């Protein structure tokens, strides 16, 4: 049996052109925030969801109102789970009717501290961020790819 070992280089100097979709833009913003903003982002989507994400990552408030931005809710829920501090993430009345239980359960399985403030399974959420304790979870195969991607983005922040 052949064994292959892949190791990351110390640094990568390159430019990557991505389309400016809201999902790619929001994921790039989260990855950049997790990496202490080490790269310059250009060509981000100008949609409301991306503007909400930029504001949420930069304003430093303990309560984050993502309005109706579903991608921001999913990516920020995972992001806040691994960043120090206690924050509340909320949104519009409609956002508070959109389920997020599958993602919250997966993050809790990794050791995240997330509380439902009003109704179980739905925003708003109180999240206390810290390094996650586990590195293995199970997800149903039919969940949103944004749930999966937000969990993958958090992988380096597990023990």
Identify what each model region corresponds to.
Residues 1-159:
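Structural preference for solvent-exposed beta-strand-turn elements
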């Amino acid at each position: 049996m052949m064994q292959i070992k892949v190791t990351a280089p110390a640094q990568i100097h390159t430019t990557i052109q991505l389309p400016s979709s809201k999902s790619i833009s929001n994921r790039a913003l989260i990855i950049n925030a997790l990496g202490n903003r080490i790269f310059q982002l250009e060509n981000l989507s100008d949609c409301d969801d991306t503007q909400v994400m930029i504001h949420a990552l930069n304003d430093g408030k303990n309560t984050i109102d993502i309005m109706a931005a579903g991608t921001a809710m999913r990516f920020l829920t995972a992001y806040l789970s691994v960043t120090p501090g206690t924050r509340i993430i909320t949104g519009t009345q409609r956002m508070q009717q959109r389920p997020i239980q599958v993602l919250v359960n997966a993050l809790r399985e990794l050791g995240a501290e997330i509380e439902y403030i009003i109704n179980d399974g739905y925003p708003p959420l109180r999240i206390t961020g810290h390094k996650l304790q586990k590195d293995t979870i199970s997800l149903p195969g039919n969940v949103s790819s944004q749930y999966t991607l937000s969990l993958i983005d958090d992988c380096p922040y597990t023990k």
